[in-house]
């Protein structure tokens, strides 16, 4: 297990990650159709799209055909697909934009600036915001007070807490101040406040998780014609039991057998053996987390401690190779 200082350093890098966005008002809602100036912003990857709605409503106010629309009426789409507002922005980009996982070279070029007129460049990520015609069949409506978003986040935290500890007592026993503070720290990207509260929920380093809170997002076939997401979720223990040993041998030599550390490679091989025939080497596909390819040897528990999103989940996107 890496030291707490190393895990904190990785977590800081994750929270510092930002994504350039170019957001346009839906032409059908604009007084000047597609001539409305876009809204440009570099936004934290761990944040959520609804947090942008108040400023977008104000920015596009003079262009809206319907001036009675509210900020919480807003929703986003990418290439005609409504985006799930309960998923972090960075995850949505990794799912839909189709860019290759970041390397040192690409990261440097992103920092150098971006050309908003280069339609072949995946950055900035080009989104459309709508303030009417809510897609009720695909998205739950938001509310003016932000409680729908808050409740969705806290429920996700509860699920992750239950998987890690076998109980959700941790999140349920948080004070009201800490419970609301956890969500506010993610909204405001305040890592120190987040760490203070999340450390209450995480078992100490010398105490393994019960299971790993991980969701794996699979690519859809090009001809699927469906914008829905395919998600794999199954209990993944942080340690691999020595199941290859016969029961009789196990009983005799239990004291001498130590479980192996579960890596992202071993977890994917177990859950998706056709895509990941090898535990050590990506052959057909590779796991992507926060825009970067994850080493197959990375222990899953360390990934959760250092690289989980604000709700405590590892959201891993599978990208096909070749």
From Swiss-Prot:
Q: Which Gene3D superfamilies does UniProt cross-reference here?
A: 3.10.20.620, Autophagy protein Apg5, helix rich domain, Phosphatidylinositol 3-kinase Catalytic Subunit, Chain A, domain 1
UniProt keyword Nucleotide-binding, yes or no: no
Cross-linked residues, Glycyl lysine isopeptide (Lys-Gly) (interchain with G-Cter in atg12): 158
Q: In the UniProt record, which is one GO cellular component term?
A: autophagosome
The principal localisation class reads membrane
Superkingdom of the organism of origin: Eukaryota
Q: Which Pfam families match?
A: ATG5_HBR, ATG5_UblA, ATG5_UblB
Q: How is it modified after translation?
A: Conjugated to atg12; which is essential for autophagy.
Q: Which UniProt keywords apply?
A: Autophagy, Isopeptide bond, Membrane, Protein transport, Transport, Ubl conjugation
- Tell me, what is one Gene Ontology molecular-function annotation carried by this entry? Atg8-family ligase activity
Subunit info here reads: Conjugated with atg12.
The text of the family note is: Belongs to the ATG5 family.
**The protein's name:** Autophagy protein 5
Task: Supply the gene name.
Answer: atg5
């Amino acid at each position: 297990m890496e030291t707490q200082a190393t895990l904190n350093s990785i977590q800081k890098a994750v929270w510092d990650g930002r994504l350039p966005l170019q957001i346009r008002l839906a032409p059908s809602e604009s007084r000047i159709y597609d001539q409305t100036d876009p809204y440009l912003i570099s936004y934290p990857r761990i944040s959520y799209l609804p947090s942008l709605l108040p400023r977008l409503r104000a920015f596009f106010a003079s262009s809206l055909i319907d001036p009675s629309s509210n900020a919480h009426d807003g929703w986003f789409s990418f290439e005609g697909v409504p985006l799930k507002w309960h998923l972090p922005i960075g995850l949505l980009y990794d799912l839909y934009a189709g860019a290759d996982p970041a390397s040192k070279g690409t990261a440097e070029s992103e920092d150098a600036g971006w050309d908003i007129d280069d339609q072949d460049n995946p950055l900035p990520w080009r989104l459309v915001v709508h303030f009417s015609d809510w897609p009720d069949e695909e998205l739950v409506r938001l509310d003016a007070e932000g409680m729908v978003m808050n409740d969705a986040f806290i429920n996700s935290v509860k699920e992750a807490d239950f998987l890690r500890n076998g109980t959700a007592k941790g999140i349920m026993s948080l004070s009201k101040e800490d419970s609301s503070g956890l969500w506010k720290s993610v909204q405001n990207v305040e890592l120190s406040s987040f760490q203070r509260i999340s450390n209450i929920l995480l078992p100490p380093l010398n105490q393994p998780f019960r299971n790993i809170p991980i969701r794996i997002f699979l690519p859809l076939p090009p001809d699927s014609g469906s914008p829905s997401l395919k998600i794999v979720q199954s209990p993944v223990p942080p340690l691999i039991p020595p199941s290859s040993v016969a029961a009789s041998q196990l009983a005799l030599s239990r004291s001498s057998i130590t479980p192996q550390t579960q890596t992202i490679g071993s977890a994917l091989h177990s859950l998706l053996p056709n895509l990941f025939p090898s535990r050590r080497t990506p052959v057909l596909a590779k796991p992507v987390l926060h825009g970067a390819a994850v080493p197959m040897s990375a222990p899953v528990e360390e990934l959760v401690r250092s690289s989980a999103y604000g709700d405590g989940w590892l959201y891993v996107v599978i990208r096909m190779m070749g």
